[in-house]
C-alpha cells in the first residue's frame, strides 16, 4: 500500500470512529456537541496532512505518548517494568509535551494516545493536553486514581477520554493487577457513567483470558457499566511467551470481533490486529510512532529503540529520522501481517539500526 492509499485508509478510519461515536451518544447533548466540533477538526487535520502528502511527505494521523513511567500498581508481566524506564528526573516536562502537542496540531495529527506508567500521575501534562481541543486524547489508565476531582476534569475536557485497563472479569483482573483492583475500576466506570462521559476499556488479550474476554456476557457487562469503547490489545511476549496468542487465537479473536461489530453498540478496536487491513505494521511513522517518557521517538511501544529525542528535535524531524526512514523503506513494516507485533520479532535488527544511524 503506497502512502496515498494509506493516507485515505487512515482518514477513513478516523472518520468512521467519529461517526460511530456520534451514533452511540445521540442521547447525550454535551457529548454530541463535542463530537460534532471534533469532527470539524478532523476534516481540517486531514487537509493539513494532505498538503504534506502533495509535497511528497507523510504525517501520521495519531501518536502514542507514554507521558510517565511512574505507576501506582505492580502488575504481573508489566511491559513497562521489563524495559529500562527513565527516572522521574529524566521525564519530559509539561513544557516539552506542550511543544509536542502544539506541533502535532499544526501538522494535522488528530489523536494522541496518552499512556504510562499511570498517566494520571502526570496531572500537569493532562492539564497541558486540555488546551488542545482539536486533538483527541484517549487516556489509558488503570482507573485507581479516578476520584471525583479527576472525573470533573474529564467532564470539562471531553476531548480527553478515559480508557480503563482491565484483564477481563474480577478473578483475571485481580490476579494480574492486585486484590481489589477490579472493584475499584468498576467504581470508576460508575462515576464516569453518572457524568454521562464517553469512556472505554482496554483489555490485554492473552491465551489465558481470550475465551473470557470475547464472551457475550463480558461485553454486556461493560456496556451496562456505560462503556462505549473497547480496545483489545494483543499481549506481546516480553515476560511470558506462553501467554501470547498463536495464529488460531488471533483468528478466533478476529472472527469474534467481526461478529460483535455487527450486533453491538460498542466501538470495538483490535491492536495490532486491525493493522492487517493497512497492508502491514503502522509503526515508525507510517501510521503512528511512540514517544517514551524521556522523549525518545520509538517505532512503537513494543520496539523501544530510538535515535531521536523530542526534547531537542521536532516531530517532523523525528518522522524523518534515520531509524524510521530505514524501517519504512526496507520492507520491515510492509507485507503479510496476521497480528502480533512485527517489530518485536525483529528486536535485534531494529536495535542495530538505531545504534548505527
Name each model feature, range by range.
Residues 21-24, 297, 301-357:
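Flexible mid-to-C-terminal extensions adjoining Fe-S/redox cofactors in radical SAM and related proteins
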Residues 40-60, 275, 309-326:
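Short, charged low-complexity linear segments at domain edges
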Residues 63, 285-287:
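Short loop/turn microsegments at loop-to-beta-strand junctions
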Residues 1-10, 174-284, 293-298, 307-310:
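Radical SAM enzyme [4Fe-4S]-AdoMet core and its adjacent flexible, acidic
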Residues 94-114, 120-233:
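Radical SAM/AdoMet-radical enzyme domain recognition
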Residues 71, 75-78, 281, 295, ...:
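Short cysteine clusters
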Residues 2-149, 157:
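Conserved alpha-helical substructure of the radical SAM core
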Amino acid at each position: 500500500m503506497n502512502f496515498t492509499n494509506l493516507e485515505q485508509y487512515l482518514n477513513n478510519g478516523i472518520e468512521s470512529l467519529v461517526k460511530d461515536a456520534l451514533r452511540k451518544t445521540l442521547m447525550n447533548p454535551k457529548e454530541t456537541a463535542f463530537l460534532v466540533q471534533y469532527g470539524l477538526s478532523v476534516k481540517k487535520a486531514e487537509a493539513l496532512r494532505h498538503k504534506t502528502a502533495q509535497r511528497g511527505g507523510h504525517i501520521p494521523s495519531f501518536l502514542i505518548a507514554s507521558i510517565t513511567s511512574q505507576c501506582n500498581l505492580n502488575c504481573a508481566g508489566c511491559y513497562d517494568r521489563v524495559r529500562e524506564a527513565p527516572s522521574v528526573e529524566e521525564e519530559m516536562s509539561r513544557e516539552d509535551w506542550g511543544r509536542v502537542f502544539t506541533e502535532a496540531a499544526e501538522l494535522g495529527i488528530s489523536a494522541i494516545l496518552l499512556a504510562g506508567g499511570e498517566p494520571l500521575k502526570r496531572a500537569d501534562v493532562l492539564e497541558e493536553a486540555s488546551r488542545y481541543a482539536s486533538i483527541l486524547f484517549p487516556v489509558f489508565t488503570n482507573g485507581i486514581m479516578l476520584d471525583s476531582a479527576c472525573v470533573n476534569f474529564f467532564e470539562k475536557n471531553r476531548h480527553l477520554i478515559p480508557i480503563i485497563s482491565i484483564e477481563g472479569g474480577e478473578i483475571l483482573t485481580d490476579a494480574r493487577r492486585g486484590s481489589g483492583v477490579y472493584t475499584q475500576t468498576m467504581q470508576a466506570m460508575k462515576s464516569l457513567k453518572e457524568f454521562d462521559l464517553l469512556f472505554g476499556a482496554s483489555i490485554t488479550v492473552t491465551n489465558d483470558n481470550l475465551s473470557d474476554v470475547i464472551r457475550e456476557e463480558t461485553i454486556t457487562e461493560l456496556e451496562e457499566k456505560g462503556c462505549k469503547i473497547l480496545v483489545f490489545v494483543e499481549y506481546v511476549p516480553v515476560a511470558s511467551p506462553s501467554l501470547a496468542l498463536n495464529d488460531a487465537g488471533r483468528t478466533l479473536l478476529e472472527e469474534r470481533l467481526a461478529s460483535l461489530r455487527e450486533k453491538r453498540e460498542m466501538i470495538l478496536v483490535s491492536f495490532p490486529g486491525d493493522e492487517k487491513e493497512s497492508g502491514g505494521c503502522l509503526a515508525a511513522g507510517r501510521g503512528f510512532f511512540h514517544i517514551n517518557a524521556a522523549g525518545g521517538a520509538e517505532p512503537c511501544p513494543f520496539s523501544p529503540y530510538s535515535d531521536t529525542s523530542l526534547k531537542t528535535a521536532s516531530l517532523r524531524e523525528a518522522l524523518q529520522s534515520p531509524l524510521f526512514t530505514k524501517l519504512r523503506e526496507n520492507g520491515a513494516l510492509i507485507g503479510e501481517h496476521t497480528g502480533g507485533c512485527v517489530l518485536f520479532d525483529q528486536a535485534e535488527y531494529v536495535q542495530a539500526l538505531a545504534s548505527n544511524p
